[in-house]
């Protein structure tokens, strides 16, 4: 099958989860981000909405045996990924655990996680599901753990409920931080590059979130790839603006 002819949402394991042409990048950028945030091989990771193991195939190779956990209602996505790219040998070696519930439950593994990643989940959920999911994630998060999630930012908040895939919904930064506060979590918007969404970090303790110095290293830039040139050109524009502004106000 010619993957380039597929559209996001098509019935193929590399297309159902997003733009098939960016399947490789969207998996790799999650892996890079979590490693930058301190993910080590011994940590427990929950891939919330793991889909076709787009990033999971990288985490599986990196993490120790029994440290990768995935929740995905569409079981066929995981099965197709194992058959076509991950391989049964890696599954047997690393012994990941999967659950197929569609109720956004995270306690099904009876584990506490160092990291919970939810890429492009809250871009398809109403307020009711966000509240449920974040509450469940908090209960399954270690005291010094991190929730790493994306949202599509907008001026006007989506006012509906339920799961709206493949449609997308938007929330303002103020509303996103309110979701966190209502759950008893601290939130931080980070500048890590995403082609369509914005990355947020949530933690039980504010000290677990990156400070201003650390945030400088959370860019996620991709060099020498025209498709993702915005990942570093935007940063360059900001730097030039700051330098120009500084020369204007300083003697």
Label the predicted regions.
Residues 115-128:
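A short SAM/SAH-binding and catalytic strip from SAM-dependent methyltransferases
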Residues 44, 144-146:
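Short glycine-centered segments of the SAM/dcSAM-binding site in methyltransferase folds
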Residues 106-116:
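A short acidic, Gly/Pro-enriched loop at the edge of an enzyme's catalytic core
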Residues 1-37, 52-108, 125-132, 136, ...:
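Class I (Rossmann-like) S-adenosyl-L-methionine-dependent methyltransferase catalytic domain
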Residues 42-51:
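Conserved class I S-adenosyl-L-methionine
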